[in-house]
């Protein structure tokens, strides 16, 4: 059971648990537990009703008072998705489908060691292969100062190393050839000599005084700690825990996980020496932001932002993994710039699975309560292993993302959270995976401890949540770690969810099976999440304020073209955006074309991730 407690959408639109007000000052805070939805100052009720279907499964049936006719197909109408036909007929256009005249292929040579000095890179055998045009190394890129690039959180990482590899699978050099098969042969022929060093892979040992300094390239870096962050009142929280009737403790490890989209990452870069412009086809969830970052990397060689055009075609799954700028992208772009021909790089599955990780959080949690289950205090101390660079996309104001939402949907007075992030000899960590800026880790911490408390005092997991929920009349509510919760009715929402799935029947079935020696688990999770990556006063990527834009053109025929700074990876923008516009303009949704993903035509926006834009 998942309870979307206070699911905020600053951008607005349709969220995964209901319809959010998307217009004007009401651009947030309206979901299934609310009594009504605001749209342009007009309130209508009810937004959502639930109808049980086929016993315990419980189908959510959304019933709206539709403003438009079925022919117009505005919000609330069940319509055919406009984008599905091309995918079902195999006519999707992905990055690997892009073919340009004279296009070359790139394959990357990667390090077999987690930590090693590069003694030499011998290109001769590779360059002797017919069809191999170039082998690009860090030394080659260093001549143009293109061998380093920023991450999304103001850290830095190598595009290609010049002397030291920092993690197994790190990019060492790239082979450019007339086709992929020849490029693979060339990569196998490159002879790299290494001097392996003892790798530092234990995040706890990374903080030892005698630990090797992994990032001496960073000015002022004296140890392997990236940052220390804390929020709340340590002393008052410790005192409340010490005085409590019941205290449960646990060290929770959320290990590294990886996005496994059907489509891996890829890029086609084409530099035109005549116009001095770079055209890039890219698997990107945030094309405009990536263009800005690439300009930061390559602006000094003439590739300023207005000379870079990024087109994000159809994307075969994003989940946060296609938000960052990966070294492979920059290498391909640099290769096209240096050679003067289009260069394609498509990550293979093996490469994909050894780069771009999320999580790796070690969380020491303490939850204190009265003997009858009323929570009094929560404390969590976290060690985050970010690998050799911090690849998080967190706002600069919140280096740990939204981890301070870890107090959850519960009412208690005292909380304290702290986090230490460290470097190790692992692939870059901190990449998003299906979460809004560390919310998943935060939710796991508090929910695991609430379940542990329920087991300790032998209380039903649902009952202990009801006992501790923020009450409807307490909103707006100030959390002990500084968040302002605008509205909600958590009790009613969980009650409805339990009714829909038949919770009481499941409990009876569980008891019967346990009597027979069988195991059956029932899981409950309730959470409050900050989503939408906004407003801009609080959220940014490398100083770029988080906002989004739209442009609508109505043709003389009465049809319309709408362009957005977002980018769909399956969210259904072509349908849902058209429905929203149909609602407002009265133009049939079938007559509204949605265009996004091209930085030359779409207005500037920060893309689609962390529940930004409209999932359907």
How should each PLM-predicted stretch be described?
Residues 1-48, 353:
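C-terminal core of ALDH-fold dehydrogenases
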Residues 70-222, 250, 328, 534:
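Flexible, low-hydrophobicity surface segments
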Residues 77, 83-86, 151, 223-267, ...:
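Glycine-rich loop/linker segments at domain edges
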Residues 108-138, 174-193, 267-339, 395-407, ...:
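Alpha-helical support elements that line or immediately flank enzyme active sites
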Residues 136-170, 204-216, 285, 289, ...:
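Short, surface-exposed loop/turn segments at secondary-structure boundaries that line and modulate
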Residues 138, 305-313, 340-350, 376-381, ...:
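Beta-strand segments within the central parallel beta-sheet cores of soluble alpha/beta enzyme folds
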Residues 171, 177-179, 337-387:
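Phosphate/diphosphate-binding loops
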Residues 212-299, 471-559:
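Helix-loop-helix junctions that connect adjacent transmembrane helices in secondary transporters/permeases
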């Amino acid at each position: 059971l998942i309870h979307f407690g206070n699911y905020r959408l600053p951008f607005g639109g349709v969220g995964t648990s209901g319809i959010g007000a998307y217009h004007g000052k009401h651009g947030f805070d309206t979901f299934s537990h609310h009594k009504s939805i605001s749209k342009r100052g007009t309130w209508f009720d009810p937004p959502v009703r639930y109808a049980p279907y086929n016993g315990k499964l419980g189908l959510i049936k959304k019933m709206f008072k539709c403003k438009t006719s079925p022919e117009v197909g505005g919000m609330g109408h069940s319509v055919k998705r406009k984008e599905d036909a091309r995918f079902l007929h195999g006519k999707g256009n992905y990055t690997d489908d892009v073919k340009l005249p004279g296009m070359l292929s790139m394959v990357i040579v990667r390090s077999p060691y987690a930590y090693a000095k590069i003694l030499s890179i011998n290109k001769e055998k590779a360059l002797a292969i017919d069809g191999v045009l170039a082998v690009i190394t860090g030394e080659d890129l260093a001549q143009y100062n293109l061998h380093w690039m920023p991450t999304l959180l103001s850290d830095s990482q190598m595009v290609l190393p010049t002397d030291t590899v920092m993690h197994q699978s790190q990019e060492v050099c790239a082979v450019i050839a007339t086709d992929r098969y020849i490029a693979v042969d060339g990569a196998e022929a490159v002879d790299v000599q290494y001097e392996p060093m003892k790798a530092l892979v234990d995040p706890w040992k990374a903080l030892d005084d005698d630990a090797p300094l992994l990032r001496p390239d960073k000015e002022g870096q004296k140890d392997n700690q990236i940052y220390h962050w804390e929020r709340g009142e340590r002393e008052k929280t410790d005192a409340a825990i010490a005085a409590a009737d019941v205290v449960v403790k646990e060290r929770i490890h959320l290990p590294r996980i990886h996005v496994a989209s059907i489509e891996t990452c890829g890029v086609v870069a084409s530099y035109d020496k005549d116009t001095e412009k770079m055209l890039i086809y890219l698997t990107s969830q945030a094309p405009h932001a990536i263009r800005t970052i690439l300009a930061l990397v390559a602006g000094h060689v003439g590739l300023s932002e207005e000379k870079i055009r990024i087109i994000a075609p159809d994307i075969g799954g994003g989940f946060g993994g296609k938000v960052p700028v990966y070294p492979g992208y920059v290498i391909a772009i640099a290769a096209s710039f240096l050679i003067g021909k289009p260069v394609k790089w498509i990550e293979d599955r093996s490469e994909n699975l050894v780069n771009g990780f999320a999580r790796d959080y070690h969380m020491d949690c303490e939850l204190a309560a009265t003997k009858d289950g009323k929570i009094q205090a929560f404390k969590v101390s976290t060690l985050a292993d970010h690998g050799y660079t911090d690849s998080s996309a967190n706002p600069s104001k919140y280096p740990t993302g939204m981890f301070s939402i870890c107090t959850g949907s519960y009412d208690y007075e005292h909380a304290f959270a702290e986090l230490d992030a460290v470097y190790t000899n692992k692939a870059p960590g901190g990449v998003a995976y299906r979460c809004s800026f560390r919310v998943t880790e935060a939710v796991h911490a508090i929910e695991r401890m609430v379940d542990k408390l329920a087991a300790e005092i032998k209380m039903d997991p649902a009952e202990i949540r009801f006992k501790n929920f923020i009450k409807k009349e307490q909103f707006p509510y100030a959390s002990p770690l500084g968040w302002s919760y605008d509205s909600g009715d958590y009790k009613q929402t969980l009650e409805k969810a339990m009714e829909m799935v038949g919770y009481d029947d499941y409990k009876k079935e569980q008891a019967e099976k346990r009597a027979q020696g069988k195991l059956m688990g029932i899981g409950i999770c309730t959470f409050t999440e900050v989503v939408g990556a906004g407003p801009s006063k609080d959220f940014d990527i490398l100083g770029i304020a988080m906002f989004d834009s739209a442009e609508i053109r109505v043709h003389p025929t009465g049809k319309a073209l709408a362009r957005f700074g977002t980018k769909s990876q399956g969210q259904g923008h072509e349908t849902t955006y058209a429905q929203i516009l149909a609602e407002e303009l009265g133009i049939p949704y079938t007559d509204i074309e949605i265009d996004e993903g091209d930085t030359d035509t779409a207005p500037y926006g920060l893309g689609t991730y962390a529940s930004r834009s409209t999932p359907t």
